[in-house]
Design a protein with these regions (language model features):
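Phosphate- and other anionic-substrate recognition elements at nucleic-acid/protein interfaces
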Residues: 1-128
């Protein structure tokens, strides 16, 4: 039996992984083939310019690759809630992931996930 994963083109999406902290979050954007779009972006929670730039980066990737995005925020206490609401109010498909799930899906001992969170979440959602 083959271990190949076959994707339905109607189900492809851009994955946006956000590692949420108290004062700032790290955002990474990945394509369905697990290639990253640009560098991780630091979102400052108290800066409207930073929040606007994050939204612009997501929309730019959606337009460039003609795919919708799905945003996955790692739940960190209550710190994820304002960012979740902001992005949802901007029209994005957002989900909050329990950090225990993301930490249990890898054997890599990393305190902060940053870039890896996108790949971990994609594996959880697509069972790659």
């Amino acid at each position: 039996m083959s271990n190949k994963v076959i994707f339905n083109l109607d189900e492809l999406f851009i994955s946006v992984g956000i590692d949420v902290g108290a004062d700032f979050s790290w955002m990474s954007i990945a394509l369905p083939n697990q290639q990253f779009v640009g560098k991780p972006y630091k979102i400052l929670h108290n800066s409207i310019d930073s929040l606007t730039t994050a939204v612009s980066k997501i929309k730019e990737a959606e337009e460039l690759y003609s795919l919708e995005s799905r945003i996955f925020l790692e739940s960190t206490g209550i710190y994820h809630y304002p960012l979740f609401c902001y992005l949802r109010d901007k029209g994005f498909n957002c989900s909050v992931i329990n950090p225990i799930i993301t930490k249990n899906s890898t054997n890599i001992n990393i305190r902060k996930v940053h870039i890896m969170i996108v790949l971990i979440l994609k594996k959880l959602l697509w069972l790659v």
